[in-house]
A protein has these predicted regions:
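Thr-Gly-centered strand-to-loop micro-motif
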Residues: 13, 29, 79-81, 110-111, ...
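Helix N-cap/beta->alpha junction signal
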Residues: 20-23, 43, 84, 113, ...
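Acidic, amphipathic alpha-helical patches
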Residues: 7, 59, 155
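Conserved catalytic-core segment of nucleotide-activated headgroup transferases in glycan assembly
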Residues: 51, 56-136
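Active-site-proximal region of nucleotide-activated glycan assembly enzymes
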Residues: 1-48
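Short, intrinsically disordered, charge-balanced linker/junction segments flanking boundaries
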Residues: 176-179
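Acidic donor-binding loop of glycosyltransferase active sites
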Residues: 142-174
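Short active-site oxyanion
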Residues: 12-16, 76-77, 105-107, 145-146
Length: 179
């Protein structure tokens, strides 16, 4: 119940939001996004074959596999998609703000360049939340706060777990978005 209130406040700050599907359009409406700001565009990636959406059961399993389960409790997953230097700090601050508001928020970080992992590990080591580095393999601990997906080719798959996605290179001083 708290998630929609927070999402509604955040979504009202956007001039326009582009939904990749009718399902995404409906979810944005449910979160309280003003209808006049939602534009259904379909996928704007013209060179990528879109796979099937995972079922709700598969989504739950994927969340558990990422260490983002909390039993019957609702977990809000924030995705940092194709992030660039400096954006992870903003995402960690956003996560902290949401947690302070009483919402169980987990962060899935997928940097644009996996070779930035050493830099990101230094940042994660300073956090007070349990984290995991995907490229190390092995057993993912349960009840993670942050999952660093420093792997290549998994973004579309991992994105299906998110409740809200931040797209990298969209904060100042960056200009022009992803290339």
């Amino acid at each position: 119940q708290q998630v929609p209130t927070l999402a509604r406040r955040m979504l009202k700050k956007f001039r326009g939001i582009y939904a990749a599907s009718e399902l995404d359009h409906a979810r944005l409406l449910e979160l309280g996004c003003p209808a006049e700001r939602i534009h259904s565009t379909g996928s704007i990636k013209f060179d990528v074959a879109i796979g099937e959406r995972c079922t709700e059961e598969a989504r739950t399993t994927l969340r558990e596999d990422l260490g983002f389960s909390a039993g019957d409790k609702k977990v809000f997953i924030l995705l940092g998609s194709s992030t660039w230097a400096g954006e992870e700090i903003a995402l960690l601050e956003a996560q902290r703000t949401v947690i302070t508001a009483g919402i169980d928020c987990r962060l899935l970080l997928v940097p644009r360049h996996a070779e930035r992992a050493p830099e990101l590990l230094q940042l994660l080591k300073a956090q007070d939340l349990p984290w995991y580095q995907r490229s190390t393999g092995g057993v993912v601990p349960e009840n993670l706060g942050i999952h660093l997906a420093d792997t290549t080719g998994e973004l579309a798959y991992l994105s299906q777990t998110a409740d809200l996605a931040f797209i990298g290179k969209s904060l100042a001083p960056n200009d022009g978005g992803q290339t």
